[in-house]
């Protein structure tokens, strides 16, 4: 899983800290039908270029077979996945897909009841591998001036990602369909320590602290302690 969040730097203002979370299917515990817990994860973080971030991430992916990549639809992520892991299962985060749908419906429908009913119907179709039906239903909505651009944007987003939106199939295979674990990881690994009130980081300092946070949350703190003892 991959995601980005902003930290405030002295040199460049707000700058994206990219975070990757790698875990095995065996580390996912089902608490109930709507909740899962991940017992062990490896993290990587990088402030800046996605090329350097991906180099770090690929190191953690090496031992993983039958890879699954869940992301929000950023083009650079899918380009990387297609080039580096063409055999991997790619999944568009369901909740981002729903968010785009809701944003469109918010301006398309005047009546709240009608809006919610339409959204629920489309989400049910998505969860049953019927993204093509949803695309057709969006096309059939009357185009009004204020939604023309948003409608086309939604259609493009769904069409470009349709092969990554087989949510029933993924669930039947025991796969996650949401990027909640990486979003919560960003809060826990990065933001909880690096977005406190008044904080401004040098780029170098932010990266160094992120490296320490990643080691800690990946249960690799012991390796750092060994290096310190060896250097003492």
What are these regions (language model features)?
Residues 1-232:
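Catalytic center-proximal scaffold of phosphoryl-transfer enzymes
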């Amino acid at each position: 899983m991959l995601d980005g969040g902003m930290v405030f730097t002295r040199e460049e203002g707000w700058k994206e800290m990219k975070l990757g979370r790698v875990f095995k299917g065996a580390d996912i515990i089902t608490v109930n039908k709507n909740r899962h817990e991940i017992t062990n994860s490896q993290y990587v973080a990088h402030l800046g270029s996605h090329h350097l971030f991906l180099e770090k991430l690929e190191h953690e992916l090496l031992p993983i077979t039958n890879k699954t990549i869940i992301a929000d639809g950023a083009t650079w992520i899918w380009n990387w996945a297609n080039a580096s892991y063409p055999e991997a299962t790619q999944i568009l985060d369901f909740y981002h897909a729903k968010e785009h749908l809701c944003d469109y419906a918010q301006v398309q429908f005047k009546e709240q009841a009608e809006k919610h009913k339409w959204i629920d119907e489309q989400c049910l179709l998505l969860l049953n591998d019927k993204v093509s039906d949803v695309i057709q239903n969006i096309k059939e909505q009357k185009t009004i001036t204020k939604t023309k651009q948003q409608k086309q944007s939604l259609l493009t987003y769904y069409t470009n990602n349709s092969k990554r939106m087989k949510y029933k199939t993924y669930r039947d295979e025991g796969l996650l369909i949401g990027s909640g674990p990486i979003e919560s990881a960003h809060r826990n690994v990065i933001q909880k320590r690096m977005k406190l009130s008044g904080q401004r980081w040098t780029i170098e300092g932010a990266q160094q602290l992120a490296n320490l946070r990643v080691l800690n949350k990946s249960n690799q703190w012991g390796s750092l302690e060994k290096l310190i003892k060896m250097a003492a």
